[in-house]
Amino acid sequence: MHGLARRRPAKVARETATLDRLSGGRLILGVGLGGDQFAGEFSKTGEQVDDRTRGQMLDEALAILVAAWSGEPVNHRGKHYLINDVQFLPRPVQRPRIPVWAAAFPANLKPLRRAARYDGFFPVNLEGVDEFAQAVATVRELRGNNRAPYDIAVELRPGSDVAPYAEAGATWWMTELEPGISLDQVRGVIQQGPAG
């Protein structure tokens, strides 16, 4: 997941288009707010700590990215960002744009709305499969009649039972690894491969 509100959208537009081209059109951009709860990283570096403001910055940055990936000139005058007649070329391989997955706390409606507007949902700080199922139901309701492909990712520890999450709507499973895990442990998880 990418704390997009911490970055300049024009730079991210170019970086993501390049990554999408290098990967042959396989990039998925995961975005979220991030937070200061991780050792005060935002407040200690002079970055925005207010969730609401970072949410506004994230939404504005996403609008810029979508416009930039179109290959058309971008003119944006927002509360947080300004772009005057810039054309971002080359375009990404994927059309109409690079897929965006939005992270959200399952009980927070505003980020769930954001996730519903894009291509995927990545719930964070899950308490279990029941909370996951409720969040999936909410996102599906928010998407309404939108039948475009949509992904729902879940992050679980190695050895977790994935089946209940798949039944609740998960389309992707990602392995959750603690920050202090050793390289040998990571290699072990990779070599073990997916359960089942």
What residues fall within each predicted segment?
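Active-site-adjacent structural elements that line small-molecule/cofactor binding pockets in enzymes
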Residues: 1-196
